[in-house]
Each structure stands twice: as structure tokens, then as C-alpha cells.
Amino acid sequence: MIPVVALVGRPNVGKSTLFNRLTRTRDALVADFPGLTRDRKYCRAEWEGHEFIVIDTGGIDGTEEGVETRMAGQSLVAIEEADIVLFMVDGRAGLMAADKGIARHLRSREKTTVIVANKTDGIDADSAVGDFYSLGMGEIVPIAASHGRGINSLLEQVLLPLVSDGLAEAEDEFAPWPDDEAEVLAREEEEEPFDPQSLPIKLAIVGRPNVGKSTLTNRILGEERVVVYDMPGTTRDSIYIPMVRDEREYVLIDTAGVRKRGKVTETVEKFSVIKTLQAIEDANVVLLVIDAREGISDQDLSLLGFILNSGRSLVIAVNKWDGLSSETRDEVKEALDHRLGFIDFARVHFISALHGSGVGNLFESVNEAYQCATKRVSTALLTRIMRMAVDEHQPPLVRGRRVKPKYAHAGGYNPPIVVIHGTQVKDLPDTYKRYLMNYFRRSLGIMGTPIRIQFNEGANPFAGRRNTLTPTQLRKRKRLMSHIKKNK
């Protein structure tokens, strides 16, 4: 599960500066939902190949007595969502009453916390952080966020414990890309057959507040299904609900909390950005619910962007379709085509969760998307498709030389990854890369999931090697050099 890091502290201690430094941007909201997330910013960040989510909470400007009340708002939610809290203080201003109040609250929540003393550039850091040890929260990490000093050591201390388990698993599973097609084929023969269809499909239902996620979830659970049991999820408040439909096992990831089975009336749903993002990360297929009466919003596009970046399969459900006039429906479809043209691989369903129309068809697209995302494809087939694509449309010249793709093999699944080996393949223009991606998609019949193309250039075995000249070649070279010197 992707780690979550929350930044908390008084105003003007540098939380936003550190947020921008970690995310390498100055305006990178994953989502900004009115009301519930107005005072919190979320962004996906990466360090040394490790991904994590950063939450910037707005300053807590209450007094020592009032800070407990202040923390009950947006910052409290961020702290509960986080795996680790970076408690930021001002190294120049020293220890303040509000810092003590925040520290008391953090201790009461028993959250893993690291005190980060900012603005320590140009001063004696050891002396500046001395007062903060009285908070009794362990070691203090001095940084200068505006200049980027101390950021790497901070991330080492914060992230490495969170990703250590993931690193061990990755090392066990990692195998370098072979440079030889025969080696790939031999490795495929050695692999034990694995059937992803034997596993339950993890389906996350996500969307903005009040689009009908609650109603759709209850409709799914109340329609011709066998609910095995309700199992609280390991990711904070999300609920994992194993269920069976048409003899196929699913795990429904419910981000809207526990609701009574019989209650299908629409209510205002408590919405957590982190719960939604983590549900997307943990799912095989994401069902994005859109309100037909409100159309596509910027928040919907933000969620779509996160889903695509995560490489998850996608099915779109346009809810509240009942009651719309034919003219309004045509306008909605036109708007969808205009704003969602970049994800033409996803199936779009028009449903009414309240009345159940169109809900049953969703699972056909969910199963299709999962099958396409986990389909095993041989190296021979991928190489044949690649050569057909090259024959139909030759790669352009790069620095006067023709790019030569040699062979292709599968580099991963969910999403499908095709690795193309060859000379200068990394220099292909984006237009040709998109052509290859679309060609593979059409040839393999992939729907409902993004597909990624990666390029690998084998090392030149003759690089740096100099041929030994024969005696005849040495005499010829000597005469040539003598001739050149005479003509100068």
C-alpha cells in the first residue's frame, strides 16, 4: 500500500514549501474537493523510486488552550489518514505554546511522528533545535525546505521504514530484462502457469460526493448475490466486502463506510481523498461514478488522472440517467465525448443506481477489463505484432539512422506492459510510440485497461573496443599520416 505522509504545524513554519519541494511542483493537487478538502492538499510524490502521498494541512493558529479544537478539523482528518506525521516547527522562532499543544495532541493519537525543524540555514542547527527535545518526541531532523537542504536525510528516515517490506518483495521478484530473445523464450517455458482468473477481482467504487456511490454499492450487494462476510479493511476506514456474483468472486472496496443493506436512499457521503486514492491503488478494476446531471467536473478529471497514472483498469458509470429528457441525454453524451476522448479504451455505462437499470451490465465490463489487464501473451506473439506494426508504418529516421526494433516481450500485467528491444528505440518520437501502443491494443483486443510500452536498448558489445591493426595496416597508416603532415 502506498505510504501517506502528513505535514502538520503552526502557520508559516514552511509546510507548503516542503510540500512543493517533495512534489517538485508548485500547483500539483491530486484533488481539491469543495468543503471537505478545502484546507488540505494532496499530491503523489516519488523519491528514489518509492512513491508516497503527501498531505499539506494548513496552519494551526490556535492558542495552547484552543489548539485541541482547531485540530478537530481538517488537520485531525489528515493525521488519522497518515502513516507518518511530519510535525514541522520553526527553528528560528523556537518553541511556541501552539507547538506544545500540537505535540500533546499527536502523542494522544499515538501516531508515528517525526519533528522537522525548518529554517535552520545560516544558524547553528544543534542549538536551534535544543528546545524542541522537551516535547519528548524523539530525534529532531533539521532542514531548510526553501533551499532543499536536509530533505534526502529526512526522507531516508521517514520512508525507508515504510517501504522496507515492499523492497524485500521487489528484490525477490526482480529479474533484469534479458537482451536475447531466446533467453526470454526459455524463461517463459520455465515459469509455472498462473491463472489470475482464479483470484477474486478487487473492485473499487469511487467518485465525488453525492454522485450515488452509496446507492450503487447497496444495489450491487442487494441484487442476486451471496455476501460471504464483511471484513474490515486494513486501509483505515475502507471496508472490503467479499461477494459472489454469477459464480465469480469479487472483493468490493467500499470507500463510503458501512451502511445498512436495506438502505438505498441517497445520502450525503462522507468523503476522504486518501481513502479513495488508496482504494484505487489496491484495486484491480476501478468503477468511476459520474453524476449525469452535473456532468464531468475538474474533480472527476483529477480522479481519472490518478487512475490512469496508477495503471488501473477502468469502467465508467454515468449515474442518475433516469428522468433525463432525450435532448439532455444527447447533450451529456456529447460532453462526455468531448472531455473523455483521451480514454477511449474505457467502457461507459449509463445507469440508474436507484432503480437498478443498467447496473447488471457493469460486471460484464468489469470482467472484460480484468481479463484484458491480466491476459498472458507470449513473446512470439508480441514480436509478431511488433513486426507487423513496423511493416505497416516504418519508424522515422533518428539522427539519420533508421530505428530497428528487434523483438518484444511482456514486462508486466495489470496494466499490461510491452517491452520492445532494439537499437535507438528510446529515441522514437512520441507520435510513433502512441502508434505502437494503439496497434498493440487493437491487435490484442485490449479494452478497459491502459497499456504501457517500454523501450530497452541493449549495450553495444563493441563499444570502447579498438581493433588491433595488422603490420600492413600499420605501414599504410604511417604513410597516410606522413602525407597529411606534408600537406599542412
From Swiss-Prot:
Transmembrane segments: none
GO biological process: ribosome biogenesis
This protein's UniProt keywords: GTP-binding, Nucleotide-binding, Repeat, Ribosome biogenesis
Binding of GTP 2, residues: 207-214, 254-258, 319-322
Residue stretches making up the KH-like domain: 375-459
Residue ranges annotated for the EngA-type G domain, each copy included: 3-166, 201-374
Binding positions (GTP 1): 9-16, 56-60, 118-121
Gene Ontology molecular function: any one: GTP binding
Protein family per UniProt: Belongs to the TRAFAC class TrmE-Era-EngA-EngB-Septin-like GTPase superfamily. EngA (Der) GTPase family.
Subunit structure: Associates with the 50S ribosomal subunit.
NCBIfam families the UniProt entry points to: GTPase_EngA, small_GTP
Function of the molecule: GTPase that plays an essential role in the late steps of ribosome biogenesis.
Protein name as annotated: GTPase Der
Organism from which the protein derives: Sodalis glossinidius (strain morsitans)
